[in-house]
Amino acid sequence: MTIAVGKFTKDENDLFDIMDDWLRRDRFVFVGWSGLLLFPCAYFAVGGWFTGTTFVTSWYTHGLASSYLEGCNFLTAAVSTPANSLAHSLLLLWGPEAQGDFTRWCQLGGLWTFVALHGAFGLIGFMLRQFELARSVQLRPYNAIAFSGPIAVFVSVFLIYPLGQSGWFFAPSFGVAAIFRFILFFQGFHNWTLNPFHMMGVAGVLGAALLCAIHGATVENTLFEDGDGANTFRAFNPTQAEETYSMVTANRFWSQIFGVAFSNKRWLHFFMLFVPVTGLWMSALGVVGLALNLRAYDFVSQEIRAAEDPEFETFYTKNILLNEGIRAWMAAQDQPHENLIFPEEVLPRGNAL
């Protein structure tokens, strides 16, 4: 019996090998298998957004002007969510709502579902791109893992939250002022700023900004392998083997400032990864809770005392009154399909009034 030792080689490359060779070859812009998902989805999402903000009105869904064609600017234009009556319909162009009529599809808000779904899969494609490239050059996949934070936030805010509510109508529209309106809505109807998951998200994002600033400044402060270039960006040879800054000096400096300091580069950089990604994930979990109408902290004893005693008021009770005002003033204009009318006497007023 003969035993052949070695690698099995095929006489001919099959279709998979041909595609793999073309997709993953070295070129200026890497394509890869992930590019089959990333590039079409990103193209359609961005293209749909530009089309909507340029030409498409929100008159039929929100009673608003939302395009450059109607006189909006970059801050006020948006691709608006479908009407509440359409609930969670995917609003496919060939579906029963639009029936292949592109104009009707745009009027119904079909561009929003188009942008949201292609955007979500585009972000997932970008994360897979980082996985694929990391594997190709034999790096660990922490970049892709970190990018799961923005994906979690996007999916929770634009997809999971409206799925928990009555329809896509209550998701954010894709525009600057539209996002601001959504933030006010979250505060008024969910008291979002008093939600512990929002607090963790703020701590993560702002803490990461602080860490980034401190880290960048510290490295700049402790450079020692300086060259003779005209400025910092030309002074270093990118292929030099040795490091260009002193971790020991940085450790000594922050030990004197705070009494404690990072002494290990791996722990330092993992912490800089952990803080923002955890913050984003906590925010995403909080929004999933809001989709189910879970409440934030309620300090009922303060509300009861404020209702009984006109002279007792806290920042919490003032915020509760502000939230009531947001709901009363916002609901009527934000949900015109409900035909809400609030008499002047039921609109909330603070104790000072």
Curated annotation (Swiss-Prot):
PROSITE patterns, alphabetized:
REACTION_CENTER
- Tell me which residues bind chlorophyll a ChlzD2: H118
EC number, UniProt record: 1.10.3.9
Ligand binding (Fe cation): H215, H269
Q: Which SUPFAM superfamilies match?
A: Bacterial photosystem II reaction centre, L and M subunits
Q: Tell me the residues on which Phosphothreonine occurs.
A: T2
Pfam families assigned to the protein according to its UniProt record, in alphabetical order: Photo_RC
Question: Per the database entry, which stretches of residues form a coiled coil?
Answer: none
Question: What GO CC annotations are associated with the protein?
Answer: chloroplast thylakoid membrane; photosystem II
Q: Which reaction does it catalyse?
A: 2 a plastoquinone + 4 hnu + 2 H2O = 2 a plastoquinol + O2
**Family per record:** Belongs to the reaction center PufL/M/PsbA/D family.
What does the protein in this record do? Photosystem II (PSII) is a light-driven water:plastoquinone oxidoreductase that uses light energy to abstract electrons from H(2)O, generating O(2) and a proton gradient subsequently used for ATP formation. It consists of a core antenna complex that captures photons, and an electron transfer chain that converts photonic excitation into a charge separation. The D1/D2 (PsbA/PsbD) reaction center heterodimer binds P680, the primary electron donor of PSII as well as several subsequent electron acceptors. D2 is needed for assembly of a stable PSII complex.
HAMAP family, alphabetized: PSII_PsbD_D2
Protein name, UniProt field: Photosystem II D2 protein
Q: What is the lineage of its organism?
A: Eukaryota, Viridiplantae, Streptophyta, Embryophyta, Tracheophyta
